[in-house]
């Protein structure tokens, strides 16, 4: 049973997810973005591979930017394989965006792009760590599980703090709306009282009442 469980964990850790898509060339290309989340201090490794070549009538560009406004990498007119690595300065959502600009009219062109994004423990070079610390394969896998568990806890804590901030913002907005509504009611009531008093004085002046 222990070996079966450990084998399942090993299989889970060895899975690598990649996104493949086609990006048509256009004179005014719209960005095609892939979004992910990373905790503060974690390393992110992005591997991109495209078919075609530089000078084939298409200018494939990309940039990496996070929700805090930090631009981690930008490159224009790339083909084949490219690796990008950066360390997140803060917990944030980041976007990997692609644009494919056509250089000439009359041709229907596109690029096939494959993107693989790894962060945290998945982005570390575990073979190098195993050699440096002289760890056995089982110890390496346990270290991976431990780090992944820590990352899950960190992400849950971040989501909890974010939920608290959103709740505080929501409650503050509700208070402002309620206070504004009360102020509108008071002003409306005062205006009605003033209008009634004005009409009463007007009718008295005209000897209507």
Swiss-Prot record:
Membrane topology: Single-pass type I membrane protein
Pfam family, one: EMP24_GP25L
Cytoplasmic topological domain: 200-209
Keywords: Endoplasmic reticulum, ER-Golgi transport, Golgi apparatus, Membrane, Protein transport, Signal, Transmembrane, Transmembrane helix, Transport
One Gene Ontology CC term in the entry: endoplasmic reticulum
Subcellular location: Endoplasmic reticulum membrane; Golgi apparatus membrane
Residue span(s) of domain GOLD: 31-119
Residue ranges that the UniProt entry lists as topological domain Lumenal: 19-178
Principal location: endoplasmic reticulum
Signal sequence, start to end: 1-18
Biological process according to GO: endoplasmic reticulum to Golgi vesicle-mediated transport; Golgi organization; intracellular protein transport
Highest taxon of source: Eukaryota
Transmembrane parts of this sequence: 179-199
Annotated function: Constituent of COPII-coated endoplasmic reticulum-derived transport vesicles. Required for efficient transport of a subset of secretory proteins to the Golgi. Facilitates retrograde transport from the Golgi to the endoplasmic reticulum.
UniProt similarity note: Belongs to the EMP24/GP25L family.
Protein name: Endoplasmic reticulum vesicle protein 25
Protein species of origin: Eremothecium gossypii (strain ATCC 10895 / CBS 109.51 / FGSC 9923 / NRRL Y-1056) (Yeast)
The encoding gene: ERV25
